[in-house]
Swiss-Prot record:
Binds 1 zinc ion. Pfam families: dCMP_cyt_deam_1, dCMP_cyt_deam_2. GO terms for biological process: cytidine deamination. NCBIfam families: PRK09027.1 (NF006537). One of its GO terms (cellular component) is cytosol. This is Cytidine deaminase. Disulfide bonds: none annotated. It catalyses: cytidine + H2O + H(+) = uridine + NH4(+); 2'-deoxycytidine + H2O + H(+) = 2'-deoxyuridine + NH4(+). Keywords: Hydrolase, Metal-binding, Zinc. Substrate binds at N88, L89, E90. The gene is cdd. The active site is at E103 (proton donor). Homodimer.
Length: 296
């Protein structure tokens, strides 16, 4: 079991903890498939809802909040039945808008893993307005069931009435819907090819600034992030922040980063290079490779 879970595992009921410990192997980064969730439910003799709430301390252990020191964990349950943990991330000494909220982390985890719809969000603190707006961008976002400790579950529409969303800006294919933009780039570099794939899967209906970031660590592992825009603009999630959240979930240190690539569309109304460099240079003393690509 990874050291970061030693304290949080003690907060779980013993039967649940005993069943979970073998799953917290060295490569665990917050994903449990539907069968594993069923195993935990059976072994603990708890309901699925009780298990998900009980797992929140494990999700919170993925957090990296050097500014607030407030650890928030969230779990996104996909339509597949799999669950995806996420946690808040803050960049030391940097402006607060670079922060990643736990719900954003969990949702981006699910999206990067191929999920196409979130049905439940479980979180240990009431979602802030920023996260409510972020969730509202998702497929059937208003129907997502929000679960909080010691409270009744409610759909997102309960927390965000009279919501402003994609449909108000004539966007009919929301975040996580199956869609891909094709780009042309001739490269044999595996890291650039990976970034190209993720840029094509990014979500930028308001600016057409499709983009992705790939981070490589010294051992050759890669961690990606995609751009995820929002109808309210400010809650948009930048690809560098998503990539850093991905890296931290995998229990890697910022000092492990050896290479960083931003790939973005030449036809976008904005560029993410400035914000991406700011975030990168806060955590790693390396240069950003910036590649601009043409849509097919």
């Amino acid at each position: 079991m990874q050291d970061r879970f030693i304290r949080s595992i003690t907060q779980l009921p013993t039967p649940l903890a005993d069943a979970l410990i073998p799953m917290l192997h060295q490569n665990f980064a917050g994903h449990l498939d539907a069968q594993q969730l069923a195993t935990l439910t059976s072994a603990s003799k708890m309901t699925e809802a009780e298990v998900l709430l009980a797992l929140l301390p494990i999700a919170a252990a993925l957090a990296k909040p050097p500014i607030s020191e407030f650890y928030v964990g969230a779990i996104a349950k996909g339509k597949s039945g799999d669950i995806y943990m996420g946690a808040n991330l803050e960049l030391p000494g940097e402006a607060l808008f670079h922060s990643v909220h736990a719900e954003q982390s969990a949702i981006s985890h699910a999206w990067l893993s191929g999920e196409s719809q979130i049905v439940d969000i479980i979180v240990n603190a009431s979602p802030c307005g920023h996260c409510r707006q972020f969730m509202n961008e998702l497929v059937e976002g208003s129907k997502i069931s929000i679960h909080l400790p010691a409270q009744e579950s409610h759909p997102l529409a309960y927390y965000l009435p009279y919501a402003f969303g994609p449909k108000d800006l004539n966007v009919t294919s929301p975040l996580m819907a199956k869609q891909q933009t094709e780009f042309a780039l001739d490269s044999a570099d595996p890291m650039i090819i990976e970034g190209l794939d993720h840029a094509g899967l990014s979500y930028a209906p308001y600016t057409q600034s499709f983009a992705a970031v790939v981070l490589e660590t010294r051992d050759g592992a890669t961690y990606c992030g995609r751009y995820a825009e929002n109808a309210a603009f400010n809650p948009s999630m930048l690809p560098m922040q998503m990539a850093l959240s991905n890296l931290v979930r995998h229990n890697r240190e910022f000092s492990d980063i050896s290479r960083a690539v931003l790939i973005e569309s030449s036809q976008g109304k904005i560029s993410l290079v400035g914000a991406t460099m700011d975030a990168l240079h806060t955590v790693a003393a390396i240069e950003l490779e910036h590649i601009v690509i043409d849509p097919v």
